[in-house]
Amino acid sequence: MLQLQIASKNDLSVITELAKIIWNTHYVPIIGQLQVNYMLEKIYNYDSLIEQFEKKNHQFYLIKLEQSVIGFLNISSNSDSDFFLHKFYIVAESCHKGTGTSVLDKLQSILQPKSITLAVNRQNFKSINFYFKNKFKITSVKNLDIGNGYEMNDFEMVKHFN
């Protein structure tokens, strides 16, 4: 059975390990190993994750299938019912089986959002198509200098709920 479990600071090592596995599998062909290494160190180091938990009020969820953790997501609230999905990652073995759509459905039932916004790399065609399938629409193009000569070149996408 698929579950979303609220993560705590005790789960940081699980989140970091999953990020390494998923990013090295999924993102190396898109942005290259050096940028993957840089971003993993920048975003998933202990201090950065603690800041996301404590200062930025991000809520992390572990995605569990039976007893195994197969991914995680991170969301924050822009208002009472508008949310930003910062991270949404599932291990490759669990992709293309309806898992991602089921996770979004569960998240929607938990949050009862008016909207969910996210950013996705413009070359991440599999994820873009997944979000289109789940009724997200591109609202803008973003280019963000993340340091060390790297840029994030993203589409911002949003899904509105009734």
Predicted regions and their residues:
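Acetyl-CoA-dependent GNAT
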Residues: I6-L12, E17-C95, T101-I110, N143-L144, ...
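C-terminal "cap" of GNAT-fold acetyltransferases
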Residues: K114-I128, F132-K137, V141-N162
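Extreme N-terminal starter segment of soluble prokaryotic enzymes
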Residues: M1-L4
